[in-house]
């Protein structure tokens, strides 16, 4: 019995390690998910995260490897934005289907973030990888930079997809170039003002590759200003308008790997997962 109590105490210490003593209780969709009687959660913890894994599921079988990816995803986002870690943990949920996502958030998706509640929901299964870098960036950017201004959907999603960094086994830019060759480019003013009405794959990758260019060229500070104040084609970074920067970037963008017709067709059918 004594040995059993010692083991239990050790498990409690391990499960709570890495969290601040003043950690806030889950809120928003995280609190709703934890209170949903249709779901049984395995509770784990790694630095910066309280993790909830659907019991008897695909992610439950691979929970150690999934958890190991989370701290590096947060560090990656922090490095991109050049910020300190969040003071409070992110509540992150692993599930295995879009149907389960609909039950939890009311929408059919494979990844979802609620930055105001520091909540992330991720689908992963044998045919779909978890997009932890994408959704974690949503939370970290939202917490660090605040509420995004007008005409910034492209920046919000571009930053998140830039954090993920790839589509299938290719870079965002390589898939974008293949799509642009086949489907054409989305005009930048349209990306800026009508982002949510564009084809998801093309819009997300075009925004991601452009945001990646902006970060590398100007750093995060001007992007934070765009995020906060809102963006327009004549917004100025480094003495150039966004429109001029985008035109120059598009003309100079080059592929590092070429997709076959079959590889591009598979991505168009399945998506980046």
Model-predicted regions and their roles:
Residues 107-115, 124, 131, 147-273:
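Acidic/His/Gly-enriched intrinsically disordered linker/tail segments
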Residues 1-4:
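Positively charged n-region of N-terminal signal peptides that target proteins for export
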Residues 24-29:
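Cleaved targeting-peptide boundary
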Residues 9, 59, 93, 122, ...:
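Amphipathic, positively biased hydrophobic alpha-helical segments used for protein targeting
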Residues 7-16:
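Bacterial N-terminal signal peptides
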Residues 18-23:
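Boundary at the C-terminal end of the N-terminal hydrophobic targeting segment
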Residues 30-148, 152, 232-237:
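Juxtacatalytic substrate-recognition/specificity segment
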């Amino acid at each position: 019995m004594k040995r059993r109590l010692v083991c239990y105490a050790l498990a409690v210490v391990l499960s709570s390690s890495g969290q601040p003593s003043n950690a806030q209780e889950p809120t928003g969709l995280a609190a709703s998910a934890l209170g949903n009687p249709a779901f049984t959660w395995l509770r784990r913890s790694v630095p910066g995260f309280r993790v909830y894994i659907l019991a008897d599921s695909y992610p439950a079988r691979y929970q150690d490897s999934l958890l190991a990816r989370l701290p590096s995803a947060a560090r990656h986002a922090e490095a991109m934005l050049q910020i300190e870690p969040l003071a409070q943990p992110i509540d992150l949920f692993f599930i295995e289907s879009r149907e389960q996502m609909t039950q939890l958030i009311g929408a059919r998706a494979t990844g979802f973030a609620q930055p105001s509640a520091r909540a992330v929901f991720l689908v992963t299964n044998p045919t779909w990888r978890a997009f932890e870098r994408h959704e974690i960036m949503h939370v970290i950017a939202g917490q660090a930079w605040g509420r995004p201004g007008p005409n910034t959907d492209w920046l919000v999603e571009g930053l998140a997809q830039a954090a993920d960094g790839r589509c299938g086994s290719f870079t965002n830019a390589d898939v974008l170039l293949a799509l642009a060759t086949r489907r054409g480019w989305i005009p930048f003013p349209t990306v800026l003002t009508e982002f949510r009405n564009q084809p998801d794959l093309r819009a997300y990758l075009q925004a991601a590759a452009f945001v990646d260019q902006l970060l590398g060229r100007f750093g995060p500070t001007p992007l934070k200003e765009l995020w906060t104040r809102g963006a327009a084609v004549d917004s100025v970074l480094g003495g150039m308008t966004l429109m001029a920067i985008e035109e120059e970037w598009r003309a100079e963008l080059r592929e590092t790997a070429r997709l076959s017709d079959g590889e591009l067709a598979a991505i168009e059918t399945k998506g980046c997962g």
